[in-house]
Amino acid sequence: MLAQVIVSGLAMGAIYALVALGHAFVWKTMNIVNFAAGEFVTFSAFIFVATFINGFNLNFLLAAFFAAAVMAALGAAFSRIVFARLQNQRVFVAIISTVGFGLFLKELARIIYGPQPLYYDGPFGQGAVSLGGVMITYQQILIFGVAITIMVGQYLVLRYSMLGKVMRATALDRETAALMGIPVNAVLAGTFAYACVLAAIAGILMAPLFFVTTEMGTLVGLKGFVAMIIGGFGSIPGAILGGLLLGFSENTAAFLISATYKDAIAFLVLLIFLVIRPEGLIPEANADRA
């Protein structure tokens, strides 16, 4: 039974890790925290289920692609229209703008899709496979597969591609990058759009696990932020490890103690890390040398 709980926790941790990756990217490149991440999770789940699955009767892959594309467009538009005008202001001004945009997305979802929760059975229904006596649902396998693919692909792009070099140069010094001819505003917009795509994928993968509601992404966005702090503020490998650790910790502790305290446990883990290891599991400086 405990093994089953651990697998479920790691699957949820992989979702937290995707959101945490978006937080880490935005922080490293734009020096802000995107507190709208949870609402991007929510809005993408609504668009995916209500518009593309139920409305247009698209298959899972096409619906996921279009939902992610809509989130990317929203993220890029926010960066070019709002953040580009605020980047010379104090940091908290840009951060507050993400809070406002998140509230806008949540209310927009409520207006368009209504207050009633939506149910989506997923592409595999309730199908599962037994591995060593542990039942793993096909949806959990999909979550692990998508998360691993994204993480490996992201590492290869950042490490070996010209796009990765451009993004790293922009993250290190925007002014120098601009002098070198790098279109900094376009890179920033692309970074924010990518973070929104990661949040969208998290929402799409979550949709079959829970009812789709206007509140479904709020805690996920916060826990993604917590995962990034646990892993090391701005550390990309740390964000992955922090997400998995957070999912494992909250699910296992909820099983051993009480599910009532599941969310509280996640933030208790954060407090413990802030006291014992405030720099996180993999500090950003160490991650950059990796």
PLM ranges: what are they?
Residues 12, 135-213, 236-242:
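Helix-loop-helix "hairpin" substructures at the membrane interface of multi-pass membrane proteins
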Residues 1-19, 47, 57-63, 89-94, ...:
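Membrane-interfacial amphipathic/re-entrant helices at transmembrane-helix boundaries
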Residues 23, 57-101, 108, 241-246, ...:
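Alpha-helical transmembrane segments within multi-pass membrane transporters and channels
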Residues 7, 29-77, 81, 256:
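Membrane-embedded helix boundary and interhelical linker motif in transport proteins
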Residues 85-160, 187, 252, 257, ...:
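Transmembrane helix-bundle core of multi-pass membrane transporters
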Residues 2, 36, 61-62, 92-93, ...:
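Residues that define the loop-to-transmembrane-helix transition and helix capping
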Residues 16, 20-22, 58-68, 189-199, ...:
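Transmembrane alpha-helical segments in multi-pass inner-membrane proteins
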Residues 45-50, 68-74, 101-108, 146-154, ...:
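Hydrophobic core segments of alpha-helical transmembrane domains in multi-pass membrane transport
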